[in-house]
């Protein structure tokens, strides 16, 4: 993400609902939504035994590294990546060049079903983030600190 995005409660609730629904619809163990800076936005499913901070950071690093590889071969990016393990597999998808949707699943589901459900969830998330950007760019959406001057801060901390 080029700049920090302000998250409003309404959109945050919608994002969590999409992640919860994806967990159920794809029969996934865990779903994460991470921004490209490595900040965890949402998590759904069996997250108890996962270091979510590390997962978010490593996801962002992986997207950056794969973006570099994509450019080397003439691609803009690899919008979807799949990593298959013995017990668990991981599918990640870039959503609207802003965030990364990460799905961890086992053999109770198939890669095809997960990809299908991720495409649907990605479209929903793209719509939510577009609305969020418009809301943040709208009138009266500037920083709440923009009108505070250095004098105001000095006065606040003076006796």
Regions found by a protein language model. Name each.
Residues 2-28, 37, 41-159:
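Acidic, low-complexity cytosolic segments
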